[in-house]
Amino acid sequence: MESIWQGGLPIRMSVLLSILLYSFGVVAAVAALALIRPIPRLGLRTRRRALVAWLLAIACGVGTLIWPTHETRVASPVSRLDHIVPIYQFSEVHETTIEASPERIYRGICTVTVNEIALLRTLTLIRRFGRPGPDSVLNPPGDKPFCEVALSSGFYLLADEPPSELVLGTFVAAPKAARANPPPQITAATFMAIHSPGFAIAVMNFRLRSIGSARTRLTTETRVFATDATIRRRFAAYWRVIYPGSSIIRMMWLRAIKRSAELPAVAD
């Protein structure tokens, strides 16, 4: 079963803040309706009460958006992800157990197509507000492997170590000068060297660990490192809005990998 309750307090805080943000949004929407027509059964008997409820909900919602972030430092690296992003402020971890060998699962990670990942196209459609655009992770063609789409639209392969770990990374934010003059080759070393203000990098991995005969624990973790306070504040608000959808996509991706790996097939 896929899980999001990995990685300790920072991840649980991300879940809590996102839940609170959307809850306050619902309260604000209901209070706004009560400003037009009071809703006595919800305690909003007058427009004055509705206005107070709306203002409180808006204030609390803003509070969740600007809540301070927690920085995590990896003390003892155990994965390629740990080496590439040893310091980060935002993360999410999901895992599943698959009845197949690591070799078989690893081969399938980047062959799972967009159409095989439930809700992916729906959530990316919502994220881009229904606007059309070129093929990308926000507008993925259904018949292509999602990894292929990512690597052709701003993501980079940072580590490919079968059958143990695959790492992809992208630039969430970068100064104009850096975007105009990118390095000729972007590797894990490029990401590890980023410390100048104005950057935010997102790196995700798929890590496999055998836990028995033809039984594997597959984990995916995403980390975001923002290099300065301004970028951290901006990304914190964005992260708390997109976190639920991001988590669903990763859980559905794991589920698609699991389903594909456990299908009857020629032995590895």
Positions of predicted regions on the chain:
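Hydrophobic ligand-binding cavity/cleft-lining segments
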Residues: 55, 61-158
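Transmembrane alpha-helical segments that serve as helix-helix packing and pore/cofactor-lining elements
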Residues: 39-44
